[in-house]
């Protein structure tokens, strides 16, 4: 347990370190924060905080910087303070859906970029799990003799577009007939479906095409549920200073791999969650990940992650994610 004065000093050290990227000394603290105590008192309190492992001494400076434990203490207090706050929720994602004709992938791409521009950090947005949604309609549109565009319409109103190669140039009337058949059978995808297909088709080519359509649709929905949209990738590189350039490559490999998707699934929660440094992975001591949920509606939701250095403006990021519905 630390005293109120030690807490004020810890907050001041942490905020200065985040703002300026340099270890903070007692003289600097007094000048910047108008602390009404002597430098000796500040140094003594800093020594106590160092003994508690909340701050650590820089090798080439007399100043102190926050430790991972110090960041964790600060973040826990922030989360506790904001958990009871009522905020006006932003429904920007719903606007983006309308602007992009309910194309979820396009909307999430713009959403990731917008969040990155607002937060000034790299942002990941995970595609919602459509397995929780219901397919209402399937429309087939012939783009050219050998390409069909499959438009999947979900009960939530969201739309997915899938390209489907075709060995034969089906007429628009035939594609409409196939669309109606598949739509009517959506709730019957079971062991009887293949018999229904055989009874419906008029040629082996039709049977092959419909089976391919169904497999492609199922694979697309499954794959999309794991898709991640990244905004502001370069911001993470810029945020990591020269002292930890060597850590950039493993960090980029991590966020571009399935491991980040697994992490986001593991901490899937309606509440804001913060992972700092080694809490993420032993090789990722230089970054933090702040996660939260976003909603399309009451049932369809996904995960957002904001990624930055451990010296992140946590308060700004938490306030931003707190406003997203």
From Swiss-Prot:
NCBIfam families: hrcA (TIGR00331)
SUPFAM superfamilies: GAF domain-like, Winged helix' DNA-binding domain
Tagged with keyword Transcription: yes
Family to which this protein belongs: Belongs to the HrcA family.
Example of a GO biological process term: negative regulation of DNA-templated transcription
General function of this protein: Negative regulator of class I heat shock genes (grpE-dnaK-dnaJ and groELS operons). Prevents heat-shock induction of these operons.
Gene: hrcA
InterPro entries named in the record: GAF-like_dom_sf, HrcA, HrcA_C, WH-like_DNA-bd_sf, WH_DNA-bd_sf, WHTH_transcript_rep_HrcA_IDD
Keyword match Transcription regulation: yes
Keywords recorded for this protein, A-Z: Repressor, Stress response, Transcription, Transcription regulation
Descriptive protein name: Heat-inducible transcription repressor HrcA
